[in-house]
Design a protein with these regions (language model features):
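Surface segments flanking catalytic/ligand-binding clefts of nucleic-acid enzymes
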Residues: 1-140
Length: 140
């Protein structure tokens, strides 16, 4: 299922296919805003791991209405952002760090994962996200 969703996400994002032409089960998991196959795999790992479906590529703004960032995955009720860091992110480290600082200064918690995390230790990824979701529920 995950690999089917990866393909569909990329086809929708590239506007190669319309969602009306998709298998309904696969379409129910599809997210055309997803920007990479590993983001799709990370999202599906969380959903198939029993976690709520995160929102994808949500623009976030500070209290003055200024753009802060657009995390790959986001749980708005928990103010939890999740980023997939691919190999090309090493070249953008400075900007990623600045965006992370802006998000944190606005009260958004942030988790970052790599391909190694998603593919080699998926249980740890799900567990860490689950813990952050539970922790936020207990606040306030």
């Amino acid at each position: 299922m995950t690999e089917a969703v990866v393909i569909v996400d990329m086809a929708l994002h590239s506007r190669i296919v319309d969602s009306a032409a998709l298998n309904p089960r696969v379409a129910s998991f599809a997210e055309p805003a997803t920007e990479s196959p590993m983001e799709s795999r990370l999202r599906m790992l969380l959903v198939l791991g029993g976690l709520p479906r995160p929102r994808v590529q949500v623009p976030l703004f500070d209290s003055r209405g200024l753009f802060v960032g657009r995390p790959d995955l986001y749980y708005p009720d928990h103010r939890l952002a999740i980023e997939y860091d691919g190999t090309m992110h090493r070249d953008r480290l400075v900007e990623d760090n600045r965006r992370q600082n802006r998000l944190i200064s606005e009260g958004v918690r942030l988790l970052r994962f790599t391909a190694g995390d998603v593919l080699r230790t998926p249980e740890t990824v799900v567990s860490q996200v689950r813990t952050m979701l539970v922790l936020r529920r207990g606040v306030g």
